[in-house]
A protein has these predicted regions:
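Positively charged, small/polar-rich N-terminal and surface patches that mediate targeting and assembly
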Residues: 2-109
Length: 109
């Protein structure tokens, strides 16, 4: 949890990790901007495959596409809106397997 120094008020934060097809970078940034989520860390090329459906993204001759990933530490109250935005984006290209995972943030400095 993040403690606001001035008021000692707890602010619950979550880490949201999102893996998505590289071609959706602009759309992901647009969704973050809409929700006023400014800070994130971005990995341009990551490999992987979904556990149920979707195509592998290995960057090879057989599976040439690659994913990107980002992680953002956001207030708990923005999590549901971000997950809904990810669901909507995933629905536009279900074979690409855009996924978001939410983790607790214990401490920040």
């Amino acid at each position: 949890m993040y403690l606001c120094a001035a008021k000692k008020k707890e602010k619950i934060m979550k880490a949201v990790f999102i893996s998505f097809y590289k071609a959706f970078y602009a759309e992901m940034i647009e969704e973050l901007d809409k929700l006023e989520i400014r800070g994130f860390t971005f990995w341009e090329e990551v490999q992987g495959r979904g556990n149920e459906t979707g195509e592998p993204h290995y960057g090879t001759h057989a599976w040439p596409t690659l994913n990107s990933a980002l992680i953002a530490m956001i207030p708990d109250e923005k999590v549901d809106a971000l997950l809904e935005a990810v669901r909507k984006l995933d629905a536009t290209a279900p074979q690409q397997g855009i996924r978001a995972f939410v983790l607790p943030v214990e401490k920040m400095s």
